[in-house]
């Protein structure tokens, strides 16, 4: 068994066991820290990675994303799942290619969403065809690639729960291994989604609700999206603004155990 197959099997086993948190590093350093802290798997963040390039979410290319995935895969022994946005193209072939390219980079999982960067949600039948193509690509690999299908309604200005559930059910029928609707805001919404499908559901962490709350509502996997990136960036900006405005260097006294984290 090679390294990638081992990671793939570990990732599948996580989804078959107790609910877990999959944090989202934005670069190799943050991936190493999260691994050292004790998390069992990692997922990329499209917004966090785009920030490292000085760009907004959605402005990284497939080539850049798979290179980033390869770097994270090499950085730790943890399984890596890749945020593949819409597959970097509107057609099913693009979704399939994104899965293949991420697998070639070392990833053992990836997500495909139903949002067109031009500003619309794909029609349901077309969105399901894209998931089916991604599923076919995943099943053609030599290891069990875990495909997550995302319904973007709730973060794209169309928070209609009934439509979101219909989409996730269609994606389940199309072969997705994990289902995900980022932007659900309440326990009742999460519970409704989880009860409507049989595959594991990923839930985006919600400030004010604990991991236990999300698991009680049915979540099997909890991710944090770009939030850890913004925690770090906000801390840097706050320290920099204190220096600019008051000549206050007090925030610079923080020390971190790099020898331990990067051992």
Model features per residue range: what roles?
Residues 2, 11, 227-263:
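Extended, intrinsically disordered, low-complexity segments
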Residues 2-82, 87-224, 230-238:
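Alpha/beta enzyme core
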């Amino acid at each position: 068994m090679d390294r990638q197959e081992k990671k793939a099997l570990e990732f599948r086993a996580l989804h078959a066991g107790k609910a877990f948190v999959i944090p989202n590093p934005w670069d190799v350093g943050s991936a190493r820290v999260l691994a050292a802290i004790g998390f069992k798997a990692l997922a990329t963040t499209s917004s966090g990675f785009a920030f490292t390039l000085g760009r907004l979410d959605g402005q990284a290319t497939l080539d850049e994303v798979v290179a980033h995935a390869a770097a994270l895969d090499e950085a730790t022994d943890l399984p890596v799942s890749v945020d593949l946005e819409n597959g970097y193209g509107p057609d099913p072939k693009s979704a399939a290619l994104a899965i293949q390219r991420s697998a070639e980079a070392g990833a053992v999982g990836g997500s495909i969403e139903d949002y067109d960067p031009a500003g619309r949600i794909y029609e349901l039948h077309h969105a399901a065809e894209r998931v089916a193509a991604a599923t076919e690509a995943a099943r053609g690999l030599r290891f069990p690639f875990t495909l997550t299908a995302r319904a973007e309604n709730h973060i794209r200005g169309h928070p209609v729960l009934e439509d979101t559930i219909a989409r996730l059910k269609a994606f389940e029928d199309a072969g997705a291994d994990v289902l995900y609707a980022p932007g659900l805001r309440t326990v009742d919404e999460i519970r409704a989604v989880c009860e409507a499908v049989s595959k594991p559901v990923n839930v985006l962490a919600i400030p004010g609700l604990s991991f236990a709350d999300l698991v009680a509502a049915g979540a099997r996997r909890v991710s944090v999206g770009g939030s850890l990136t913004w925690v770090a960036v906000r801390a840097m900006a706050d320290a920099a603004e204190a220096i600019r405005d008051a000549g206050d260097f007090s925030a610079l006294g923080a020390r971190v155990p790099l020898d331990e984290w990067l051992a």
